[in-house]
UniProtKB/Swiss-Prot annotation:
It is found in: Cell inner membrane. PANTHER family: ATP SYNTHASE SUBUNIT B, ATP SYNTHASE SUBUNIT B', CHLOROPLASTIC. Keywords: ATP synthesis, Cell inner membrane, Cell membrane, CF(0), Hydrogen ion transport, Ion transport, Membrane, Transmembrane, Transmembrane helix, Transport. This is ATP synthase subunit b. The gene is atpF. Belongs to the ATPase B chain family. GO terms for molecular function: proton-transporting ATP synthase activity, rotational mechanism; proton-transporting ATPase activity, rotational mechanism. The chain crosses the membrane at residues 11-31. InterPro entries: ATP_synth_B-like_membr_sf, ATP_synth_b/b'su_bac/chlpt, ATP_synth_F0_bsu_bac, ATP_synthase_B_chain. One of its GO terms (cellular component) is plasma membrane.
Amino acid sequence: MNLNATILGQAIAFVLFVLFCMKYVWPPIMAAIEKRQKEIADGLSSAERAKKDLELAQSNATDQLKKAKAEAQVIIEQANKRRAQILDEAKAEAEQERNKIVAQAQAEIEAERKRAREELRKQVAILAVAGAEKIIERSVDEAANSDIVNKLVAEL
């Protein structure tokens, strides 16, 4: 094998080139690669955290939705109970009002009946007195007439 100066010069130039690259070119490239690897790793970990946060948020949203539905159901049940209570109170109040009106009407009917009876008694008494006067005019026997008048008054 023949080693000449050209090959030796090329070998020295190659070694110098490699040393130059290792000293000045390789560190910035490695730094850029490491920086990019770190950014990718950070991005992946950030994506993992975001995924976990999303799952947690979805879980929380589901829980809150369930709680809201339960609270809404409780509120609806309370509203239905209150509605039933109000209806019962209104029915009871209406029943009391009806009973009051019926009692008042019956009292008015009874008062009107008493007034009519009293008016009728007065008219019968007037007629009895008029009849007694006619009887007295026709007959002289006062004792018999007074018995008749007393019987009429007793019947009234």
